[in-house]
Every structure is written in C-alpha cells, then in structure tokens.
Amino acid sequence: LCACFSPTLLLFLPLLFLCACGASPTPRVVIYPQHGDPIFVRVEIADSPEKRNFGLMYRKDLPEFHGMLFLFPREEVQSFWMKNTPLPLDIIFINSAYEIVNIARNTIPFSERLLPSGRPAQFVLEVNGGFCQRHGIEVGDRVELPNVPFPRV
C-alpha cells in the first residue's frame, strides 16, 4: 500500500460512501410528450415568495435541459412577466394533476406584459425559449416531478 492510503484514510472511506449514498438527487421534471420519448429537465426550485419573485432575473444563459420550477401553495391562475430577464423563455404552466395547461412560448426579454396561465396551475416550469417547439411539448402533455422537495405547508 502506498503512503497516500494511510490506515486513517481507510477508516473514513465508509463514512464518505454513506454520505454519498444519502445525498439527494438533483431535482428534475420529466415531461411526457404525446409523441416522442420522455424529456428530462434538471431544475432549480423556486419554493418561497422571494425565490418565485426573483426567478431567472438577470440570468444571461441557461443550459439546454435545465430550468426553474416554481412551486405554489395552491392551484390558481398564475401570472408571470419577463422584467429584468434577458433570456427568451418558454413558460410551461402545470396543474395539480401534473398536466400542462398552457405554454407561453418564446417570451420577449425584459417585457413587463403579464403572461397569465389562463387556467389554474400549481407549478410553472421556465426553460429556454423554443425548447417546447424543439422537443414537441404541447398543452395536454403529462409531467412528473420526481426528486422535487415539496415544502411543508
């Protein structure tokens, strides 16, 4: 055994393994388009009023298959805007039955025009503008939220 594998280090390896096993997976959204394979999106969670108000403001880039998931305490008509947001986004409104009820496509950066869900929604997913068109995502598609830590109400 080389000097870099001291007995002390070997004692900590099981602890390191246990910590790694207990780490929670990255939150993600799975979208099931009516035509095509499931789409996996890694998400940041906006689950407080402060996080929901700030959203993706001031972000200059967003990797493909990444987004922000907004969690609301109840299902109701939601409205978004693009104030201080330099990226065009697709805003996907999802109801409590995990069905897409509306999509605001290729939103205009920095616009203060309200973009309402039109129908009650409890979750909202923001992804890059054009994402829904590129991946065939439509109103009526189903969604799953595995590994999403829901806040306690």
Label each region the model flagged.
Residues 18-20:
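C-terminal motif of bacterial Sec signal peptides marking the signal peptidase cleavage site
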Residues 1-10:
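Bacterial N-terminal signal peptides that target proteins for export
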Residues 14-15:
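Residue-level signal for mature regions of secreted extracellular proteins and peptides
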